[in-house]
Amino acid sequence: VVEQGAGGLAHTAVALLRAGLHLRAAVWATLACAALSLSVETLQNFLPARVPSNVDWALNTAGGALGAVLANVFQRLGWLDAWSRFRADWFAPHAQGGLVLLALWPFALLYPAQVPFGLGQVGGRALAWLEESVEGTPFALWLPVEQLATTPLSPLSVACCIALGLLAPLLLGFSDLRTLRGRLAFVPVLFGLALTVAALSAALTYGPSHAWAWIHPPVVAGFALAGAVALVALWLPRRLCNVLMLLVLAVLLTVLNQSADTPYFAQSLEAWEQGRFIRFHGLSQWLGWLWPFAALMYGLRAVVAPPRP
C-alpha cells in the first residue's frame, strides 16, 4: 500500500512539474522517495538477515530530494519537453511499460548467466528452495526430483538461446515503435548495448582483460540468427510482435530451465558474489531472474487488450 502511494506521489510530482509548480513538485517527489524507502526499511523488520537503518532511509530521502532538484533543472532546460516530443514521434502512446522493461534489460544482463542474454533461469533454484521448504513433510513426496534430469546445452542450443534472448527485447521494442525507421534504428542500438553490457559484466567478473572472452562461435551464430529474424520482423504489426515475443520467451525459459549448470557458470557466480561489486549484485540477480516473466505479463496484457492506434 505504501509503495502504491509512493508511485501515486511520483506521478503527481511529474504532473505538477509539467504544470509549472516546481516547488510543489519537488516536495511531492521527495515525499514519494521517503515513503518508498520507509516501506522497504519497514519490511526489513520481517527478514532475519536484514536490519532496518534510519541512516539508509535518510540517505534515500536525500537522494530523492536531489533527484527532484535535477528534474527541475532539466525542466527549465527543456530536456523533459524534448524527451516528450521524441517519445511521441517514435513510440506508441501507451508504451510506458515497454519502455520501463527495455530500460531495465541492460541492468538484468549484468549478473552472470548460464547463456549470454539467457535471463530467467530459475528452475534449479526454485526446486532447491521447494526441497528445503517441504523437507520432512508429506509434500516432499510430490517433488519429482529424480525425473528432472538436466543436460548441458549443445553449441547449437546455446546459439538458439542467445538469439532468443536478443529477440525478446527486440520484439518488445518493435511492438512499441511507431515507424519502420524507428525499428531500423533500434536493431543496431539494441545489439550494441547487448555487446557493451555483456562485456562489462565479464570485466566485472574476471577483470578488464577478459571483457570479450565470452565471445565464441555460438555467440556469433546467435547474433547472426537474431539479426536475420529481426530483418523479417521489421514489417510485422505491433500486436504480432507481442505474440512472437511471448513465444520466444516461452521457448527460452523452457530450454534454459531444463539445462544443467556448467562448472564455468558456478565459477562465474562465485567470482561475482565474492567480488567488489557485491553491494549491487543482488539487485541485478533479481532483475535477471524476473525480467522475462515481467515481459511475459506485459506481452499478455498487450495481446488481450483492445486494439489501439
Named regions from a protein language model:
Residues 1-49, 54, 65-309:
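Bulky hydrophobic segments
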Residues 58-61:
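Long, hydrophobic, well-ordered secondary-structure blocks that form the structural core
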